[in-house]
């Protein structure tokens, strides 16, 4: 699963504003 998240995180950071991207990153990290 870590490989999938590593692929998604950069994409989320590009599509979403930094503040929202950080929130999503925290949620994904907690999900793991």
Curated annotation (Swiss-Prot):
Cross-link Cyclopeptide (Ile-Pro): where in chain: 11-18
Disulfide bond annotation, renumbered to this chain: none
Keywords: Toxin
Propeptide: 1-10, 19-32
Post-translational modification: Processed by the macrocyclase-peptidase enzyme POPB to yield a toxic cyclic octapeptide. POPB first removes 10 residues from the N-terminus. Conformational trapping of the remaining peptide forces the enzyme to release this intermediate rather than proceed to macrocyclization. The enzyme rebinds the remaining peptide in a different conformation and catalyzes macrocyclization of the N-terminal 8 residues.
GO molecular function list: toxin activity
Source organism, top-level taxon: Eukaryota
Function: Probable toxin that belongs to the MSDIN-like toxin family responsible for a large number of food poisoning cases and deaths.
Entry's family note: Belongs to the MSDIN fungal toxin family.
NCBIfam families assigned to the protein according to its UniProt record, in alphabetical order: amanitin (TIGR04309)
Record protein name field: MSDIN-like toxin proprotein a
Provenance organism: Amanita phalloides (Death cap)
Lineage: Eukaryota, Fungi, Dikarya, Basidiomycota, Agaricomycotina
């Amino acid at each position: 699963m870590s490989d999938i998240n590593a692929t998604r995180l950069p994409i989320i950071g590009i599509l979403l504003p930094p503040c929202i991207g950080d929130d999503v990153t925290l949620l994904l990290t907690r999900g793991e």
